[in-house]
């Protein structure tokens, strides 16, 4: 049996995953990386993309817009700004996310925050194949 590490993924809305994984593929800001048991301690920021956790049950993919990943020899903890299981992502949800970002930009959110939200959604849309 392959060596495992604890993988936890949380967003402000909910905890999305807590499993023993053989590897976690992370869309890091400095490039993609794969964490496995025994990985050197690392903290990285996430870029918008697809995060994957491989476990005995198979591979589970999540669309993330950003956040942080803390990697140790025994685990990976991801704190995502926004995360959605890839299999739950559909055009209706994507349209709702775009509408939310547009609404936020029209109610006094500063320009940089609004532009980042729209940029994140564009990247999320591309990563999810929409």
Swiss-Prot record:
It is a peripheral membrane protein. GO terms for molecular function: ATP binding; proton-transporting ATP synthase activity, rotational mechanism. InterPro entries: ATP_synth_F1_dsu/esu (IPR001469), ATP_synth_F1_dsu/esu_N (IPR020546), ATPsynth_dsu/esu_N (IPR036771). It is found in: Cell inner membrane. PANTHER family: ATP SYNTHASE DELTA/EPSILON CHAIN, ATP SYNTHASE EPSILON CHAIN, CHLOROPLASTIC. Belongs to the ATPase epsilon chain family. Keywords: ATP synthesis, Cell inner membrane, Cell membrane, CF(1), Hydrogen ion transport, Ion transport, Membrane, Transport. NCBIfam families: ATP_synt_epsi, PRK13443.1. It comes from the Bacteria. CDD domains: F1-ATPase_delta. It comes from Fuscovulum blasticum. Produces ATP from ADP in the presence of a proton gradient across the membrane. F-type ATPases have 2 components, CF(1) - the catalytic core - and CF(0) - the membrane proton channel. CF(1) has five subunits: alpha(3), beta(3), gamma(1), delta(1), epsilon(1). CF(0) has three main subunits: a, b and c. The keyword Protein biosynthesis does not apply. SUPFAM superfamilies: Epsilon subunit of F1F0-ATP synthase N-terminal domain (SSF51344). HAMAP family: ATP_synth_epsil_bac (MF_00530). One of its GO terms (cellular component) is plasma membrane. This is ATP synthase epsilon chain.
């Amino acid at each position: 049996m392959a060596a495992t590490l604890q993988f936890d993924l949380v967003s402000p809305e909910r905890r999305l995953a807590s499993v023993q994984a053989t590897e976690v593929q992370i869309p890091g800001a400095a490039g993609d990386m794969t964490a496995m048991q025994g990985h050197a301690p690392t903290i990285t920021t996430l870029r918008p993309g697809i995060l994957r956790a491989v476990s005995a049950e198979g591979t589970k993919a999540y669309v993330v817009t950003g956040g942080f990943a803390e990697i140790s020899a025994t685990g990976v903890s991801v704190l995502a700004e926004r995360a959605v299981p890839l299999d739950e992502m559909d055009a209706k949800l994507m349209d709702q996310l775009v509408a939310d970002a547009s609404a936020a930009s029209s109610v006094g959110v500063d320009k940089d925050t609004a532009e980042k939200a729209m940029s994140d959604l564009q990247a999320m849309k591309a990563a999810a194949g929409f």
